[in-house]
């Protein structure tokens, strides 16, 4: 079977190396890309990263990736966002003043303070699969443990975007969104052990199913 070729977008955000290694373990051929030229030639795109909303958006726009990502999603090129790569898909964030990509209507909000609640939400937590038939969740049991690091969480205007949630204190927050060929996780699958590797494999296999058959 032809290897799935994924472009991992390098926009000076953290955690790119771990994401690349995770995707390679999941069976993909991975290339870091620093400019948008040629993105359409890849089988899928991945936008990982740690960090704050405003610097992420500034770097994406400065490198020309903002419009390129929108165009890729419009042409139904498979896309996986991770952590800040999920948040920048939204319209804006309470963390800063930069506009987001606006692909998903809604905004990113800070966790409300609660007695005894630690912010950031950091460490292992369980997934509630609100759409268990999503391609991301093939072979993933309800209440699987995955790894989070974030102080802000996305709130889509249309709840049908949400394919998994998690609980932090009394607050239910988005753990993953998906629609069509767009997928994004607030947690870090590349840091989530065997469950995370399976989720990355599910994305790679989703991309592979869309490739032309050999000899076609």
Swiss-Prot record:
One Gene Ontology term of the molecular function aspect: glutaminase activity
EC number per UniProt: 4.3.2.10, 3.5.1.2
Annotated ranges, domain Glutamine amidotransferase type-1: 5-213
Annotated compartments: Cytoplasm
UniProt cross-references to Pfam families, sorted A to Z: GATase
Keyword ATP-binding: no
Residues at the active site: 83, 188, 190
SUPFAM superfamilies in the record: Class I glutamine amidotransferase-like (SSF52317)
GO biological process, one term: L-histidine biosynthetic process
UniProt pathway: Amino-acid biosynthesis; L-histidine biosynthesis; L-histidine from 5-phospho-alpha-D-ribose 1-diphosphate: step 5/9
Recorded catalytic activity of this chain's protein: 5-[(5-phospho-1-deoxy-D-ribulos-1-ylimino)methylamino]-1-(5-phospho-beta-D-ribosyl)imidazole-4-carboxamide + L-glutamine = D-erythro-1-(imidazol-4-yl)glycerol 3-phosphate + 5-amino-1-(5-phospho-beta-D-ribosyl)imidazole-4-carboxamide + L-glutamate + H(+); L-glutamine + H2O = L-glutamate + NH4(+)
Keyword terms: Amino-acid biosynthesis, Cytoplasm, Glutamine amidotransferase, Histidine biosynthesis, Hydrolase, Lyase
Residues passing through the membrane, by range: none
GO cellular component: cytoplasm
NCBIfam families: IMP_synth_hisH
Function of the molecule: IGPS catalyzes the conversion of PRFAR and glutamine to IGP, AICAR and glutamate. The HisH subunit catalyzes the hydrolysis of glutamine to glutamate and ammonia as part of the synthesis of IGP and AICAR. The resulting ammonia molecule is channeled to the active site of HisF.
Subunit structure: Heterodimer of HisH and HisF.
Protein name per UniProt: Imidazole glycerol phosphate synthase subunit HisH
Protein source organism: Synechococcus sp. (strain JA-3-3Ab)
């Amino acid at each position: 079977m032809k290897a799935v070729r994924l472009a991992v977008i390098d926009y000076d955000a953290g955690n790119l190396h771990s994401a690349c290694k995770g995707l390679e373990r999941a069976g993909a051929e991975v290339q870091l890309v620093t400019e948008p030229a040629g993105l359409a030639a890849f089988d899928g795109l991945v936008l990982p990263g740690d960090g704050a909303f405003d610097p992420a958006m500034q770097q994406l726009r400065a490198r020309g990736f903002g419009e390129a990502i929108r165009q890729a999603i419009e042409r139904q090129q498979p896309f996986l966002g991770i952590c800040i790569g999920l948040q920048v898909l939204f319209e804006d964030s309470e963390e800063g003043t930069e506009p987001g990509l606006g692909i998903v209507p809604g905004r990113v909000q800070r966790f409300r303070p609660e007695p005894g609640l630690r912010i950031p939400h950091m460490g292992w937590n369980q997934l509630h699969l609100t759409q268990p038939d999503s391609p991301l969740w093939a072979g993933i049991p309800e209440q699987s443990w995955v790894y989070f690091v974030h102080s802000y969480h996305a709130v889509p205007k249309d709840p049908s975007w949400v394919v998994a949630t998690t609980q932090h204190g009394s607050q239910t927050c988005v753990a993953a969104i998906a629609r069509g060929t767009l997928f994004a996780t607030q947690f870090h699958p590349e840091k989530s052990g065997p469950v995370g590797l399976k989720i990355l494999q599910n994305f790679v296999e989703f991309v592979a199913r869309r490739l032309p058959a050999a000899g076609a």
